Regions:
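Helix-rich, typically C-terminal accessory recognition domains appended to large enzymatic cores
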Residues: 6-167
């Protein structure tokens, strides 16, 4: 398998993430094109989720959490999950468990952030209640910012591109 051909076909970030996801100390990596393609789908999911969040920003959007009394149960849930993720990934990185760290970030983004939290906020984003809408946007942006920071060492190109668009 030629790295240059894989980069041209699937992108640098997908290849880097694949290599990291399957990296374990003392283990050879069994690289296949199907695995790289699978992580390219993950890159696309991240890109689409980011576009969705960014297209819902208002003019007064900012990257800071709202007051605690404004947070709804779903907001508190995702922030709790995010804090746990940050602690676990930090611990994994300190132990050089890169594959474990990226798998946790992958699972959080795919399952918690995209499949659950974004879906839970859709009604609020289209709501007439400006405070509920603004709170949802602020939490969406904050969590996106944090996951981009966690992903950046492994997917520097797409994370930088998205991060430049965050207020």
């Amino acid at each position: 398998m030629r790295d240059v051909a894989m980069i041209e076909k699937y992108g640098t970030d997908a290849l880097r993430f694949t290599l990291t996801a399957f990296a374990a100390m003392g283990r050879d990596i069994r690289l296949s094109e199907d695995r790289i393609e699978g992580y390219r789908h993950f890159v696309n999911k991240l890109w689409n989720a980011s576009r969705y969040v960014l297209m819902n920003l208002g003019e007064d959007a900012r990257n800071e959490l709202p007051a605690l009394d404004k947070l709804e149960i779903a907001d508190k849930w995702v922030l709790s999950k995010l804090n746990t993720l940050i602690a676990e990934v930090t611990e994994n990185l300190e132990k050089y468990e890169l594959g474990v760290a990226v798998q946790k970030v992958y699972d959080f983004i795919w399952d918690t952030y995209c499949d659950w939290y974004i879906e839970l906020t859709k009604a609020r984003l289209y709501s007439e209640d400006a405070i509920r809408k603004q709170t949802a946007i602020q939490v969406l942006v904050y969590v996106l910012d944090q996951i981009l920071r966690l992903l950046h060492p492994f997917m520097p190109f797409i994370t930088e591109e998205i991060w430049q668009s965050i207020p």
